[in-house]
A protein has these predicted regions:
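Active-site beta-strand/loop architecture of penicillin-binding DD-peptidases
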Residues: 1-29, 46-124
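Extended C-terminal subregions enriched in glycine
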Residues: 33-47
Length: 124
């Protein structure tokens, strides 16, 4: 979204029993903390993580994926939680996913494949 920060909301739509929309949330812009040029650089880096870096297990040739892997050590034995945060897009349809696996080790080997399954399910 070119660096535009959006107002978060929890409910996209409220429908009645017949499936009619009673209320629908509308996206609202909050601020623009990044310039478009800065956002473009970040997107290239996040794309590279998935295409040739630590997040390759979230890569797909069917849609475009961007992401970042990580791990967070939680004790002196250097055991870690695994995480992946990313987004994917295809034909104007977009999804953002955050995966955290407690005691999962590496984000690339544990969390990224879970995100891949979510992306695959979303795009069909």
């Amino acid at each position: 979204n070119d660096g535009v920060m959006m107002q978060p909301y929890l409910v996209d739509q409220v429908k009645n029993i017949d499936g009619g929309v009673i209320k629908e949330s509308e996206p609202e812009e909050m601020a623009s903390p990044l310039k478009k040029s800065e956002c473009d650089v970040l997107k290239k880096m996040l794309r590279k993580v998935v295409s040739s870096g630590t997040g390759t297990k979230a890569y797909s040739s069917e849609y475009t994926v961007y992401g970042k892997t990580g791990s967070a050590e939680y004790n002196d034995d250097k055991d870690s939680h695994a995480w992946f945060i990313g987004c994917a897009e295809k034909d104007g349809k977009k999804i953002v996913v955050s995966v955290l696996v407690e005691d999962g080790g590496s984000g690339g080997s544990t969390a990224a494949p879970i995100a891949d399954k979510v992306f695959h399910s979303f795009f069909g």
